[in-house]
Amino acid sequence: MRYDHSLWAHVCIGSVAMALFWGTFLSAKGSPLHRRIGRPFFLAMLATVLTVPPVVLLRPVPFDPGWIVSLVYLSACVGTVVTVAWTAIRWKDQPERFRGLHFRLLGPLVASLGAVVLVAGLVKGDPVAAVLSWVGLAYGTAMIYFARRRAPLHRQWWLAWHVNATLGLFTAVHGTLGFVVW
């Protein structure tokens, strides 16, 4: 695959994800339309994440390990947030399942990667990396805490996780676009 093809695939799938995001965002929450548009949005986000490796690895510039670290970190964060947003709704009546294996694996993963990105950002004097590290550090830590928490849950705990994750996806979609356009 050529770099330009991978880039166009990423742009096209990402554009579909952005359109689906806004369709979901503007629809009545919980309505059949919201669910009908929201499901393909999550799938489009996962597909967008899958198009990132070819874009990074086929770039016509010298190999840069920093880009690989960024790729792994951001892909793990987006994949985690998509999973949390989806499962919060699907498993809202099953809190133990929701905070089960995927929370116990993904929480420490994104928290650890966030720490790596923070250290790398501080060592390189890169404020963007240092700022982006908070996503993994904060979100991963919250996931670890929630997975271990055994106190009674708020009646709409699942909605808090869903909305929080969806706002994270808003940031991922629009932040990436802003970074590219800038």
Residue ranges and their predicted role:
Residues 1-182:
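Alpha-helical membrane insertion/targeting regions
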